[in-house]
Amino acid sequence: MEKTMSNSTSTPAAHRLGLVGRKVGMTRIFTEEGESIPVTVLDVSNNRVTQIKSLEADGYAAVQVAYGTRRASRVAQPQTGHYAKAGTEAGSILKEFRLDPARLAEFTPGAVIAVESVFEAGQQVDVTGTTIGKGFAGTIKRHHFGSQRASHGNSRSHRVPGSIGQAQDPGRIFPGKRMSGHLGDVTRTVQNLDVVRVDAERGLLLVKGAVPGHAGGDVVVRPAIKAPAKKGA
């Protein structure tokens, strides 16, 4: 029978346990007052501990967790031994979360971390994902430049950025100049999203608003590190 770990102890924001999962998609839920709230559904089920890292052995304290599944034929031999040592099946994602060394005794390799033991409704979280790749894009789409005139002397220069530098002096384009290029497919974190609902039975987390990436993309959910202090606290 699988064991469930708890995250009840208060720790600094930088050393709080998070969960790994995937973005299911967006929907909306209604409050008792009839208010419609747009939410993103995150599947953070079956996060299992694969390794405990200690100060003595590794130089820092952390818990390594795995999420998802992977066919045995797709797992490298060293990873196969790593998962076998933890007594758990191979995952598609491995992620470490730094913790207070005093908390390492709470975790056991092979144990499953329940979503309700880490997050609760009303809490704020930071969600990290990979944005949707949009390929090569011009400056209007990539940097929100304004277009040039549609006519009146403008010929074939309607969407070009204009001047990108000077003449012989300095004779180069300065670093950081906003130009056309690849758009999207980068790691981004959205901070301070409200947890609207926690579905413990299915291992789902419903957060208010949008999350980076497409449906099915990998995400990392952590307690908000910049959560505003409560009034009167």
Swiss-Prot record:
Keyword terms of this UniProt record: Methylation, Ribonucleoprotein, Ribosomal protein, RNA-binding, rRNA-binding
Pfam families named among the record's database cross-references: Ribosomal_L3 (PF00297)
GO biological process per UniProt: translation
Domain of life: Bacteria
GO cellular component, one term: cytosolic large ribosomal subunit
Molecular function as annotated in GO: rRNA binding; structural constituent of ribosome
SUPFAM superfamilies: Translation proteins
PROSITE patterns in alphabetical order: RIBOSOMAL_L3 (PS00474)
Disordered: annotated span: 145-172
Modified residues (N5-methylglutamine): Q168
Modification(s) after translation: Methylated by PrmB.
Family named by the database record: Belongs to the universal ribosomal protein uL3 family.
PANTHER family tied to this protein: 50S RIBOSOMAL PROTEIN L3 (PTHR11229), LARGE RIBOSOMAL SUBUNIT PROTEIN UL3C (PTHR11229:SF16)
Quaternary structure (record): Part of the 50S ribosomal subunit. Forms a cluster with proteins L14 and L19.
The protein's role, per its UniProt record: One of the primary rRNA binding proteins, it binds directly near the 3'-end of the 23S rRNA, where it nucleates assembly of the 50S subunit.
Name of the protein in question: Large ribosomal subunit protein uL3
Native source organism of the sequence: Bordetella petrii (strain ATCC BAA-461 / DSM 12804 / CCUG 43448)
